[in-house]
């Protein structure tokens, strides 16, 4: 049975602890017991604990005018003892738990300060540190990374999550967004058809930096979080609502716009959320793994493959027939939507979606029928030995390239032509050669890859 105060069984328990420069807080009813107890009485300042906390304890913002919410938990009446002159609170005093609006006025340089709250009946305080960082763009400001030169313009939006004002002021955020854009276009056919896209980003400031998980909580702009079982999750409605503020994005073209969220983490584990109407959010972490499971591989597989191309996974997890798996229903669902052109449930040469490539001399050296895909070794077929949709290599198969180009033409308001496709098609043979030399085929995929998730209907913001 425990005692209060806890017995100090070793006289050296607090050795090295400075006992005169901080206050030891304990429940009020046992203050005198602690002051008299062996070991504990060595602390020079022992006082009653009071309930007064501010959430968050730290606010970071850019130097434009901005607002943040604070929650003050107090056991009684409280007041603001002091604050920076460039900070305004919606209330300077109150009673018990209170939600406050903190307004930070615009500034021109870095500055920091402290807001101190005090319980009125006690000499007891808590604080919130406030930082304001100098940056050339404001919170949520939309930036154009590229304007289209061909067609009517296809929206491609890169946003980060888990980047706080300090990260952004250092230039980390914009550097990452530009790098992600270049990775997206560093694979065919996107490299060739790059001029069809309008590319945007916006200064999405998160209260905290990093991404949370099961045992870690992070307050971020879009709520991106790692889970144990279903990959990355986010606040999809918040993301769509945010993107709809970009002038060229509207209800009529949201389903043809691709959103790429880059969580501020080097962990692997990308995933794409897709809606039946075509809307998509690709979560693409900055993986620190080696090729082909690096950040480039995730963007090209998740964003370029799933999010825009509507391609299916070709990697294998299970040595079994797909007919025995509940995922067969998901496969057929995708097929009914006109997706997954790179996969087939039949191995008959004249019935697969890529039949026109098999006997075409320009493609017949690599295009055939290979069994295995959609996580299963049997009952599902792919067109080439290896591709980006298997293990993230920097190469899309011929049928995948065609499916992507067809979608580009559709969204750009142009008519697709197979002859034009072939004329402009670039295989990327160097990357294909690298894949066949360095990688294994038909083996299990990296352990924490997640298939895309299909949601019914349209995003709820459009309903």
Outline where the language-model segments fall.
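Short pre-active-site segment immediately N-terminal to the catalytic Zn-binding motif
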Residues: 169-173, 277-303
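Surface-exposed binding patches on compact interaction domains or structured appendages
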Residues: 51-53, 73-101
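Catalytic zinc-binding patch centered on the HExxH motif and its immediate surroundings
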Residues: 210-218, 239-256, 260-283
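Beta-sheet-dominated interaction scaffolds and their linkers
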Residues: 50-71
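Solvent-exposed loop and capping/linker segments of extracellular ligand-binding repeat ectodomains
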Residues: 1-50
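A short beta-strand micro-motif common to beta-rich folds, especially ectodomain repeats
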Residues: 110-121
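Propeptide-to-catalytic entry region of secreted or membrane-anchored zinc metalloproteases
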Residues: 133-250, 421, 426-458
């Amino acid at each position: 049975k425990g005692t209060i105060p806890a017995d100090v069984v070793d006289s050296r328990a607090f050795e090295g602890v400075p006992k005169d420069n901080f206050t030891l807080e304990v429940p009020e009813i046992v203050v005198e017991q602690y002051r008299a107890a062996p070991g504990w009485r060595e602390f020079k300042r022992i006082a009653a604990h009071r309930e007064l906390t501010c959430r968050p304890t730290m606010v970071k913002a850019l130097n434009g005018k901005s607002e943040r919410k604070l929650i003050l938990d107090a056991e009684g009446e409280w007041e603001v003892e002091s604050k920076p002159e460039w900070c305004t609170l919606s209330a300077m005093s109150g009673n018990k738990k209170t939600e406050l609006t903190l307004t930070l006025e615009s500034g021109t340089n870095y500055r920091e300060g402290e807001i101190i709250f005090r319980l009125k009946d006690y000499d007891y305080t808590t604080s919130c540190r406030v930082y304001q960082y100098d940056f050339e763009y404001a919170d949520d400001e939309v930036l154009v990374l590229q304007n289209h030169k061909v067609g009517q313009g296809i929206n491609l939006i890169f946003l980060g999550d888990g980047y706080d004002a300090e990260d952004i002021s250092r230039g980390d955020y914009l550097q990452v967004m530009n790098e992600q854009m270049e990775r997206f276009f560093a694979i065919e056919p996107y490299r060739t058809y790059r001029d069809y896209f309008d590319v945007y980003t916006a200064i999405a400031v998160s209260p905290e930096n990093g991404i949370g998980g099961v045992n870690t909580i992070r307050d971020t702009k879009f709520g991106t979080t790692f889970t144990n079982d279903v990959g990355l999750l986010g606040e999809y409605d918040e993301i769509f609502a945010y993107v709809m503020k970009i002038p060229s994005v509207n209800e009529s073209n949201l389903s043809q716009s691709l959103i790429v969220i880059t969580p501020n983490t080097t962990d692997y584990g990308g995933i794409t959320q897709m809606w039946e109407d075509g809307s998509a959010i690709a979560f693409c972490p900055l993986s620190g793994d080696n090729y082909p499971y690096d950040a480039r591989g995730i963007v090209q597989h998740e964003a370029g493959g799933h999010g825009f191309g509507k391609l299916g996974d070709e990697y294998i997890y299970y040595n079994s027939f797909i007919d025995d798996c509940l995922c067969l229903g998901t496969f057929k669902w995708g097929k009914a939507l006109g997706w997954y052109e790179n996969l087939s449930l039949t191995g008959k040469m004249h019935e697969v979606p890529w039949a026109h490539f098999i006997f075409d001399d320009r493609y017949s050296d690599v295009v055939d029928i290979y069994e295995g895909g959609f996580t299963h070794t049997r009952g599902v077929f792919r067109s080439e030995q290896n591709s980006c949709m298997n293990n993230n290599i920097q190469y899309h198969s011929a049928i995948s390239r065609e499916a992507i180009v067809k979608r580009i033409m559709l969204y750009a308001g142009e008519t697709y032509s197979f002859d034009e496709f072939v004329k402009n098609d670039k295989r990327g043979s160097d990357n294909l050669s690298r894949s066949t030399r360095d990688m294994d085929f038909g083996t299990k995929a990296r352990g924490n890859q997640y298939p895309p998730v299909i949601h019914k209907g349209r995003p709820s913001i459009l309903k």
